[in-house]
Amino acid sequence: MPVPRISREDLKQRLDSGTPPVIVDARLKYPYEHSTVKLPGAIRVNGQAATAALPRDRDIVVYDSDPNEVASSTVAAELIRQGYRAVALKGGISEWLAANLPTETKEAPKQAPPEPGALKG
């Protein structure tokens, strides 16, 4: 069964509505870590424990960086299998950015503090 898709225009309308969907960032590790932006309000989930925390009473839109939506379709299909109302964003974040739609700055990855004495010359 194919995963339902949502266009960037429809998602923008939904984000501007009173009940926006939950946005899930499903980009693979490299594209995610080498990007400075994300869709407004997007959350990153890793693993089943994280998906269990998603609200079941809201629609979920999953996106990735692949214009063919491979990762987002896989994640959306799994969420649907678990009983969520999920769709994949057509064209992923690339199409969203190409249309100059709003984004948020992504938090920089957390880095461990240097070991004591590591900065001594």
Model regions: which residues?
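Rhodanese-like catalytic fold shared by cysteine-dependent sulfurtransferases
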Residues: 1-17, 21-22, 29-62, 66-121
